[in-house]
Amino acid sequence: MKSYFCVTPSGWQETQTRPRIVPKHSEKCSRTYSRPRSSLSDSEGRCVVLPRDGGGRKRKSNGSQGRCSNNPGRPSRKWTEKTIAASRQGFFSKRDNGYWVPKSPEKKYVPKVFPRNMDNKKSFKDVLTSPAKIQIKPTPESILLAQKIQNSTFKSRGKVTLSQFSLPLINRFQEIQLTTHLEPVEESTPFGVNDQRAQHLFCKKVPRKIGRNTVLVCPITGTESHIDAKRGISARIVDSMASVVHTENLPAYERGHVVTKNVSRTKRVCTPVPIIGTFSDRAIRVECDDHTDELASASSVPSIWKPSKKQHAVPISSSNEMGSAVGTKPDWYTPVKTCTHRQYQKVQRVFLDAMNIMRTLRFHTGPQELRETWVKCWLQVHKKNVAFPGWMITPLLSGTVPCEQEFFLPKAGETRGFATVCYA
């Protein structure tokens, strides 16, 4: 019992003792009835349950205003700090037609014996006196950075300088980019929130009719896709970095800018070719087994290209659903398993890793070596026989074979491979 003084208007001090409020749940207290508004404070100490619509909260004549509103785990009275006597398994609250308040047991605080050293773990003093070991998460950028710092890994042509004007420029539009807005070209720029280079990743293009032909349009940005839904893509590789320019943009590329077609076809925007092109988001589906987790991870790229465990190449159409061998159909005719989203994400991550690495490497190696590495990477992914979305296959083909490429994408609901036509 807590006793406290209160000064009454007459000035004399009176010691009051507040009775402890313990909800008594007895059989007498049925949860359904409501008393008349006058007798809210229950003289017998029985719990009074008011219906929710009973107009306002019950106020005690006592000093205690009831427990603070939402404290279900450890309900305590507001000023007396006394924990409500609740049984071990919980209790029915007095408010809101008596919902069940579960009781969470409190953990005892047992202080650990400080000087004792369990399992030769370091003490604070050891940690503070020993030098720090810095651990870096092996993202491709951090690996490259570490290797660049160690200066042992890359055979760079001459000296690696970070100054922007001594960079060997490969793409003829990087010069424009450097002179107009000085972007740091050497490091691979991380993707921003609404990055244009990533449009093809986060924007699912939707077929819209413009005039009499159907075009795929990104509903976010309103950009038309370069694919015609019927004909497929046609693209050409334009420089030693295997930059891809789609054929209808080629005259614009020759003039030194790229035309972005808008849905209204009124505005023409002139921009230099971005370092990463945008590719189709329609998946070019190759048969997909569950080997995706064996793909090159960031830690093993680009230093060592491990061959796959199975050394022999697996023909895609070795057997049909019945399990008997099929030799008659052309090999792109195989029925296609579509990848799950997780597999797709894995492949996409590997691809982006490889792409960033190649972009960072391009200043340290010659174009020949660069292309060989690129092809090695892709051969490794090919060996795993995974599903390639179009935006991945386009740079692969255009980067490997330096000539015009045609990709025919399967129409909706059609399981068909893709054909590569190369005029050498």
Swiss-Prot record:
<feature type="compositionally biased region" description="Polar residues">
    <location>
        <begin position="31"/>
        <end position="42"/>
    </location>
</feature>
<dbReference type="Pfam" id="PF17485">
    <property type="entry name" value="SatRNA_48"/>
</dbReference>
<comment type="similarity">
    <text>Belongs to the nepovirus satellite RNA 48 kDa protein family.</text>
</comment>
<dbReference type="InterPro" id="IPR035312">
    <property type="entry name" value="SatRNA_48"/>
</dbReference>
<protein>
    <recommendedName>
        <fullName>Satellite RNA 48 kDa protein</fullName>
    </recommendedName>
</protein>
<feature type="region of interest" description="Disordered">
    <location>
        <begin position="15"/>
        <end position="78"/>
    </location>
</feature>
<feature type="compositionally biased region" description="Polar residues">
    <location>
        <begin position="62"/>
        <end position="73"/>
    </location>
</feature>
